Amino acid sequence: MLFNDNNKKIINNCRKNKFLIAAHRGTVGGNIIPNTTLSFKNALLHGADIVEMDLILSTDGVFYVFHNGEEKKVLSVDKDIRKMSSKEIDELYCYNSLFLKTNKHLERAEDVLKKLKNKCFINIDRSWFYWIEVIRFLDSLNMNDQIMIKSPVDIDLLKKLEASKSSVMYMPIIKNIEEWEIVKQYNINLVAVELIFENLNSKLLSRKIIKEFKDNSILMWANAITLDDTIILSGLLDDNVSIEKGYNKGWGKLFEYGFDIIQTDWPALLKDYRNNI
């Protein structure tokens, strides 16, 4: 593990604000499309400190902000966007939450990221399919004190990140203690860990492990989004529970465990909770 000066800004912001609020693909609904400049602006207006986004790479080497697998829902096409050229992608139209066609197109990542420069922190989620290219691209933007990339724990990805000597902030998706032990072996700029746990008996929530994170200034990220009725990312301390049963039953419990960042689809409500603790 390495500690880079790039990490100081986000760590200090966590301490100042109790915890940080991360907005899942921006804040969307109505005619605001996920993973767009407008969704990210909307998230910031709703109180988010971090916007989460996904990147794909066209066949001719252009990065776009998009979550692959959502092609049919967002673009009304039944084709893997990662197999399209930038010309093909630029010709596609986005569909809104009512599945009505809009005049909006997908946005190129460079344009989106430059608009967010010095405005907030940014988490790059799905991008590990083109790991080396992503790292080089992000390094070229000179925004490494704002941008955090993440990936599943994969030895090949960790080796490539270490070899790149990039100062970009990194956050692994940790599902068990064994994965945490693997990550610790690499000289990478580890700023945070996203902890995935199905129940509160997870060893990742043990006092010993949490103390290790805190002692090493590693931020703890909880994914409180409720994807559906079966996938559990944060031991049922999630958005739906927080809204249905009360903030203290979900987000509040995550805060009590010591989580420094909470990802949500409802940043304004989470900010309301934060303002009142």
Language-model features: where?
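Phosphate-group recognition and catalysis centered on beta-loop-alpha active-site segments
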Residues: 1-277
